[in-house]
Regions:
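Non-catalytic structural scaffold of enzyme domains
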Residues: 1-274
């Protein structure tokens, strides 16, 4: 039997998933959270999908072994490439999985007026077709325009400065989306909410942006409540952080993403069995 006092576990390739945790701390402040940033493998966006699936299975195993009542894939590439393997591991522990793709697709399909939805994501996410399938499953004959933006997540993860070069890069990625006349854009990478103001300026005020954080926090709340695992009461929850790469660089960027003090970040190392 899973105990409601256990934490919600989430992972991402880096710090992007903290945009999801940020929304969870607002919507569900009484819950405990464990967050793992797999920074030694960042970025996931260009990696071999077979290698990624093995990695995701291992991360799911490690997090659930520690004890968790829910597993959140706070990474679009990991969801697109490895949701199935994460679910297989979680099933052995009797734990449910909340991914990041489907909740966003549902919101985008519900709010579009002209049926033209853009997706800005990593190369792996676009090539997986995960968003296209999730949007087609909404059954509304939507027109989906996907654009791979491979340089954007590394740029954000490194904490680079926003300058003219960045704007030019973003304009290049947004050009086909503008041309297609989308009215809704899915930010298909949990790093991208940090550049939402820039994207909004380029696309214009009539394009609605759908980020993962809000959609996933709502899905987590629904899942916990329906399974009777939501934490009762008003106590302030705890959060702890693990990084597979250097903790100092993780801490600096992560504090900016979360807008909260991180406390100690612990480094974990594990290798995928060949």
């Amino acid at each position: 039997v899973i105990d409601a006092s256990l934490p919600v576990a989430m992972f991402d390739s880096g710090v992007g998933g903290l945009t999801v945790l940020h929304e969870c701390l607002v919507a569900l402040p009484q819950e405990d959270y464990v967050y793992l940033g797999d920074t030694s493998m960042f970025p996931y966006g260009e990696r071999d999908p077979v290698e990624l699936r093995r990695r995701i299975a291992l991360i799911a195993e490690k997090l659930l072994e520690r004890g968790a009542k829910l597993l959140v894939i706070a990474c679009n590439t990991a969801t697109a490439i490895g949701e199935e393997v994460a679910r297989e591991v979680a099933a052995r522990y009797g734990v449910e999985v909340v991914p990041v793709v489907a909740p966003q697709a549902e919101i985008a399909a519900a709010i579009t007026d002209n049926g033209r939805i853009g997706v800005l994501a990593t190369t792996n996410t676009v090539e997986s077709g995960a968003y296209r399938r999730a949007l087609e499953a909404q059954g509304r004959g939507l027109d989906v325009i996907e654009v791979a933006a491979p340089r954007l997540a590394p740029f954000i993860q490194e904490g680079s400065l926003f300058d003219e070069e960045t704007m030019a890069m973003a304009r290049g990625y947004c050009a086909p989306l503008r041309e297609a006349g989308i009215d809704t854009l899915i930010l298909g990478c949990t790093h991208f909410p940090l550049v939402a103001p820039m994207l909004q300026r380029i696309l214009g005020r009539n394009v609605r942006l759908v980020s993962g954080g809000h959609a996933v926090a709502a899905a987590i709340q629904r899942t916990l409540e329906s399974s009777g695992l939501a934490r009762e009461g008003d106590d302030e929850g705890t959060y702890e952080f693990f990084s597979t790469g250097p903790v100092s660089s993780f801490g600096e960027v992560a504090t900016r993403f979360l807008q909260m003090p991180l406390g100690e970040v612990r480094q974990v190392e594990f290798t995928v069995p060949a």
